[in-house]
């Protein structure tokens, strides 16, 4: 039996309470106009005002910490933050006298995300050995350079050393001796990049030094953080394009996006947020700029976040979605690593309606500077936090923004879904006898639910569940009586009744029943797996998938609905 063969290929073994990755509901539109979101942002601003005035107990000297925060929405026209907050530390004596969206900060390893973007738009082969572009690496005795690709370098899975030269802390030489380490000659240190001993590395010195260094891990085995990998990426892009890193940033990033502040350090002192005391501001990072030596601003990073969220960057929408994916696990149940995203799945961001929310981030740091660039793609939300001063402040400020405003965005999203999607649709008035189709959706604490679907006097929802249960349920977990639906991001502009509307394809998703516990070792162990995604698109009726439905939206308002497998035609709101 063909169906038996196909379902066996799925490998269904367990029943699960799970949902597809990605948006649970349509991303919020006009988020900045929502009163509840504005109220949350105002409350957060008051909290930061109190914190900066020393009225909130925090583990850092508030008089030394400047910071800027921006929140960006995908549906904005130009990437201008829908909310921003800036504070200049009272102890600052140098740099700008007013911190705003155009003020410059060192952004540390956010540079890696920018270097990865440059790599993606440079038109290079990502899955060939890096030695295609940097042949000097070929003659290594220690590293398997012919097994290391550009994608592995950008995804932190190449096993390349963290640094070359920089990790030898020459200024601690006497400390090592006092601790009982054996004395060594200066000649035993790397010939470049050792602060306090020698000059920064040239491209040739870096490649030669890394060629002969020890690998950190076997290539491709797991993530191992590397700064040097991104210097190699920039050198490979230079070999391919003829542009040095400064030119790459200007031509492939700043000009296309209209950025004015993003460049390799040193930046512009008059626009800089410079903390009191010693810091990395003004440093020339040289060949290390691609890994952590860029300066930027809230205005620039907001534009970049908007372009990624709105799929308007130089990458195609499919390439952008693929970029925002993990490439390896990071050692915990909730963390993974991308290219070079630091990806975290939060279970508690939306307290009123808990569900896993994935945040794609890149953090950065330099002496007295820390930064965070995060995308909450499910809500089309970008968060940028830049700090100058005590480096502990960033985590607390970022967590406050993330927890307050993602929860606020979720509430706006659910309110909109309840008003526009959780409704009844029908094609009453059909000329064909007994062919009136009625569909009704409700919204529970998790998602939209298909609560009723009929054609004439037939209960199609009951029949739908029966078809899925009898054809697929026997090979895996039982199908429950709850059928959910989720957006697919397959949206397009079409003309309906002479008007341009947005066609949204959704997929139905049956909840699965957990198997009965039995008195055997390991019973229930597989319940944490999520195999619901394997059921999609399995059953068709005359070429139309039984799980595919379509909403048609005019602006932010749902105008009509269609069930192609019922040949319903356009259905209007009936309640």
Where are the regions a protein language model picked out?
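Active-site-proximal loop and beta-strand segments within enzyme catalytic domains
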Residues: 22-31, 61-63, 73, 83-226, ...
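Fungal secretory targeting signals
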Residues: 1-15
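Well-ordered alpha-helical segments within folded domains of soluble proteins
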Residues: 113-116, 229-234, 302
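"… SH3/SAM/PH, and C2H2 zinc fingers" -> "… SH3/SAM/PH, FHA domains, and C2H2 zinc fingers"
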Residues: 100, 105, 133-136, 215-217, ...
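Non-transmembrane alpha-helical segments in soluble domains
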Residues: 45, 49, 120, 131, ...
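Bacterial peptidoglycan biogenesis and beta-lactam-recognition machinery
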Residues: 121-125, 238-246, 255-262, 307-315
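Long, well-ordered core segments of solenoidal/helical folds
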Residues: 253-263, 323-331
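Catalytic loop of the DD-peptidase/beta-lactamase superfamily, centered on the K-T-G motif
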Residues: 16-89, 102, 283-575
């Amino acid at each position: 039996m063909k169906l038996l063969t196909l379902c066996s290929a799925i490998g269904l073994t367990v029943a699960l309470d799970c949902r597809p990755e990605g948006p649970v509901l349509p991303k919020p539109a006009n988020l900045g106009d929502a009163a509840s979101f504005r109220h949350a942002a105002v409350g957060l601003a008051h909290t930061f005002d109190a914190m900066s005035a020393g009225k909130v107990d925090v583990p850092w000297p508030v008089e030394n910490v400047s910071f800027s925060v921006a929140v960006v929405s995908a549906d904005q026209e130009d990437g201008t933050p829908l909310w921003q907050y800036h504070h200049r530390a009272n102890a600052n004596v140098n740099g700008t006298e007013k911190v705003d969206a155009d003020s410059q900060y060192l952004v540390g390893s956010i540079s890696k995300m920018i270097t990865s973007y440059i790599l993606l738009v440079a038109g290079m082969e990502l899955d060939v050995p890096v030695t295609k572009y940097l042949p000097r690496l070929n003659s290594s005795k220690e590293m398997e350079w012919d097994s290391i690709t550009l994608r592995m370098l950008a995804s932190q899975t190449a096993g390349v050393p963290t640094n070359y030269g920089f990790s030898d802390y020459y200024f601690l030489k006497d400390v090592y001796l006092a601790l009982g380490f054996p004395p060594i000659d200066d000649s035993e240190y790397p010939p470049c990049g050792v602060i306090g001993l020698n000059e920064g590395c040239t491209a040739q010195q870096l490649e030669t030094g890394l060629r002969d260094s020890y690998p950190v891990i076997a290539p491709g085995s797991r993530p191992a953080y590397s700064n040097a990998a991104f210097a190699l990426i920039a050198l490979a892009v230079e070999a391919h394009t003829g542009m040095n890193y400064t030119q790459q940033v200007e031509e492939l990033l700043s000009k296309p996006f209209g950025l004015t502040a993003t460049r390799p350090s040193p930046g512009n002192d008059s626009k800089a947020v410079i903390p009191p005391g010693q810091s990395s501001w003004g440093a020339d990072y040289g060949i290390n700029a691609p890994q952590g030596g860029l300066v930027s601003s809230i205005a620039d990073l907001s534009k970049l976040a908007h372009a990624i969220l709105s799929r308007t960057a130089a990458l195609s929408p499919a390439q952008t979605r693929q970029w925002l994916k993990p490439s390896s696990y990071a050692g915990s149940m909730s963390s993974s690593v991308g290219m070079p995203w630091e990806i975290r799945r939060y279970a508690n961001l939306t307290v009123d309606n808990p569900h896993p929310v994935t945040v794609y981030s890149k953090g950065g740091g330099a002496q007295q500077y820390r930064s965070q660039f995060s995308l909450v793609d499910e809500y089309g939300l970008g968060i940028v936090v830049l700090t100058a001063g005590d480096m502990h402040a960033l985590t607390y400020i970022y967590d406050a923004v993330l927890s307050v405003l993602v929860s606020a965005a979720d509430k706006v999203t659910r309110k909109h879904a309840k008003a526009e999607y959780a409704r009844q649709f029908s094609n009453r008035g059909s000329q064909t006898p007994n062919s009136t189709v009625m569909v009704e959706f409700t919204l529970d604490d998790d998602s939209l639910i298909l609560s009723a679907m009929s054609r004439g006097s037939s209960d199609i929802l009951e029949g739908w569940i029966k078809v899925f249960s009898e054809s697929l349920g026997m090979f895996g977990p039982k199908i429950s009586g709850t059928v959910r639906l989720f957006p697919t991001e397959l949206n397009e502009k079409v003309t309906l009744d002479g008007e341009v509307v947005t066609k949204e394809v959704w997929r139905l998703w049956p909840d699965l029943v957990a198997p009965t516990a039995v008195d055997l070792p390991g019973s229930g162990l597989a319940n944490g797996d999520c195999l619901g995604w394997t059921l999609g698109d399995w059953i068709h009726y005359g070429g139309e998938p039984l799980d595919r439905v379509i909403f048609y939206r005019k602006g932010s308002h749902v105008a009509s609905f269609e069930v192609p497998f019922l040949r319903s035609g356009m259905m209007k709101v009936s309640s």
